[in-house]
């Protein structure tokens, strides 16, 4: 039996690794510093604004592909994944005359968007992140070209667009198996039904260099 005792995602001495161990064992006396911060805000509207500000700051530092905003819920509040994605997309990939968009229908996508696959499709797996490189129109159909990296450029027609969603913010569940230089975590009492200790542990351990929690300290499990 091989036992792995060393944490490789975070550096030695990382508060992220330390606090993850504490949370796993039910100890909420966390250690804060430059690599692990908590920004107090019990108000959802204020929290959404704070997360947007932190996201922009972290993207400038690490790049949009190395930063994730994690939230327990996909919808229902101002700090849910769907609402945050729309706002973040407007901040980092605003519309312009040079960027084609999908027009009409329920799925609005834009050239330059960071997107996530939500279904397995050939060599593209559920949860894979890509970037929209081109949007073409073929009669009444629209073709969206997504670069998932490693030479995987895939085409999605109008009837396949539901297989894509914006990927600036994502649920903690969807983030499992991924890692980022910086993660911003939405932690609110309004989401308490979802805030289990394993979920908080999973969210924290997605970060390699920085973890920023925004929300209500009372929501910590």
Model-derived features with residue positions:
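C-terminal accessory regions
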Residues: 128-139, 143-221
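Conserved helicase motor core of P-loop NTPases
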Residues: 1-122, 133
């Amino acid at each position: 039996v091989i036992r792995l005792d060393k944490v490789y995602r975070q550096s030695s001495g990382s508060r992220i690794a330390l606090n993850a161990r504490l949370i796993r064992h039910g100890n909420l006396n966390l250690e804060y510093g430059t690599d692990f911060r908590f920004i107090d805000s019990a108000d959802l509207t204020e929290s959404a604004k704070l997360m947007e500000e932190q996201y922009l700051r972290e993207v400038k530092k690490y790049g949009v592909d190395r930063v994730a905003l994690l939230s327990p819920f996909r919808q229902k509040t101002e700090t849910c994944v769907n609402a945050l994605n729309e706002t973040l997309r407007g901040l980092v990939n605003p519309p312009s005359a040079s960027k084609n968009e999908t027009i009409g229908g329920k799925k609005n996508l834009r050239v330059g968007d960071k997107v996530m696959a939500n279904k397995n499709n050939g060599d593209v797996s559920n949860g894979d992140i890509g970037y929209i490189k081109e949007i073409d129109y073929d009669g009444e159909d629209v073709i969206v070209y997504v670069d998932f990296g490693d030479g995987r450029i895939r085409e999605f027609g109008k009837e396949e667009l539901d297989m894509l969603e914006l990927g600036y913010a994502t649920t903690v569940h969807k983030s499992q198996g991924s890692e980022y230089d910086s993660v911003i975590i939405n932690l609110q009492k309004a989401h308490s039904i979802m805030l289990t200790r394993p979920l908080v542990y999973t969210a924290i351990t997605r970060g390699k260099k920085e973890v920023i929690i925004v929300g209500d300290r009372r929501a910590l499990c």
